[in-house]
Regions:
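Extracytosolic ligand-binding ectodomains
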Residues: 4-11, 17, 22-420
């Protein structure tokens, strides 16, 4: 009788214990342009996101020193897997907004990620802010995005102020090295938030550096002709040209420069279209000599050896396309978001928001040339640095800062008539 009583008591106690919790899978809404003029950017970013999910969900890459590479799934969510719901904004801000709403209300995603175009990120993130869902941005560079007082928006990469400061410092360092002085600059830019912010910052930095702005030329994004803009630049004849363009515009800008024999001594581009692999595929060796701020160059492999293996894996998925400055930032950003969700140990928005605020990733766990990832109160990563590349033989070579450089800057850019 006593044994029966003890057994009954034991069974009753076991019934009171909570059942083993199942793995908590995580669904993230990913908003990029998968059609339209910048579709290739979106496709490359999809490959970057899928590579991160493979790193997180399997142990195939456990030898890589990356967050979550050594485990299968999210360990703090019982091995839960990460999946993505991809949405196409086509480069349209209003579509980015509606897709963000759909992903949150219908797809029930845990967080949002995207969206490349600053103008689209601006609208899509207003939805996540209103609905209190974390939004991580990896590559949109308008400074205004982290100056809105938002509590649910986080950006891992530098903004245009950081990037532009790096480009102007690269020019100052070149002046010292060559014992010369630039006098004039010109800015030309597409007419959305990205271009307007970029040109504003460049003009402010030019004034501080003592450079005169001799031309300020906006153009309509997606323009079919840039002849008049190039003729104005040719007449102004600046020492340095600062273009801010998406891919199709960057291609047209260079082709028109060649057609009209416009020969700037230095071209210092604001990333985006000028570092998209589709750009050099379209223009070939005509790209040689162009400089751009960037976050990736194969020259970084010397400082970060694991980058070669990761880039090789990325190339398998893209049909031979290397990481670009934007796709590598997408890779890092999505990994940061997955790491934060794991540290949150929950799919609740408030827990993920808190984990993002506490992010403090060291540089050795990144494939970008940053000092780490740590967000300020505005959601901006404060441990970012700029890199400047130059096309040489159709390859993006790191030329600044000098401690990361893999090549000397070619200066001035050879005139069209001098090229072979």
């Amino acid at each position: 009788m006593k044994k029966y009583f003890l057994l009954s008591a034991l069974l009753a106690a076991l019934l009171l214990l909570p059942a083993a919790l199942p793995a908590q899978d995580v669904k993230i809404g990913v908003i990029y342009p998968f059609s339209g003029p910048t579709a290739q950017i979106g496709l490359d970013h999809r490959h970057a996101v899928e590579l991160v999910m493979d790193i997180v969900n399997t142990d195939k890459y456990k030898n890589w020193n990356l967050p979550l590479a050594k485990t299968m799934g999210l360990p703090n969510l019982k091995g839960g897997k990460v999946s993505a719901v991809f949405a196409d904004h086509q480069g349209k801000p209003e579509l980015g907004l509606s897709e963000a709403e759909r992903l949150i209300t219908q797809e029930k995603v845990t967080a949002l990620f995207g969206s490349y175009h600053s103008s689209v990120t601006e609208t899509a993130s207003t939805v996540s802010e209103r609905m209190k869902v974390p939004f991580l941005n990896a590559e949109s560079s308008s400074p205004k995005l982290t100056q809105r007082g938002f509590k649910w928006f986080f950006r891992t990469s530098p903004h245009d102020e950081t990037f532009s400061e790096g480009m102007f410092q690269a020019l100052k360092d070149l002046e010292k090295k060559k014992n010369m002085k630039f006098q004039t600059i010109a800015v030309t830019y597409e007419d959305t938030l990205y271009g307007k912010d970029s040109s504003r910052i460049e003009k402010e930095l030019a004034a501080k550096a003592g450079y005169k702005v001799v031309a300020d030329i906006p153009y309509r994004r997606g323009a079919t002709s840039l002849d008049s803009e190039i003729l104005k630049l040719k007449a102004a004849n600046p020492d340095v040209l600062f273009p801010t363009s998406y891919t199709s515009d960057a291609i047209l800008l260079l082709q028109t420069s060649k057609k009209l024999d416009y020969n700037p001594k230095v071209i210092m581009a604001q990333n985006a279209g000028h570092i998209d692999p589709s750009f050099v595929e379209a223009v070939g060796k005509d790209a040689d000599g162009i400089c751009s701020r960037a976050e990736f160059s194969l020259d970084l492999i010397k400082a970060k050896p694991m980058l070669k293996e990761i880039n090789d894996e990325f190339k398998k998925r893209t049909g031979g396309r290397d990481f670009s400055g934007t796709s590598v930032r997408c890779f890092v950003g999505f990994l940061v978001l997955c790491d934060a969700i794991n540290r949150a140990g929950s799919t609740k928005p408030e827990a993920i928001q808190d984990a993002l605020k506490k992010t403090n990733l060291p540089p050795d766990q990144l494939v970008t040339p940053w000092r780490g990832v740590k967000f300020d109160d505005n959601g901006q990563n404060i441990l970012v640095d700029a890199l400047v590349i130059q096309y040489q033989d159709k390859v993006q070579r790191a030329i600044w800062p000098y401690n990361l450089a893999g090549a000397e800057m070619v200066f001035p850019i050879p005139r069209w008539a001098e090229r072979k």
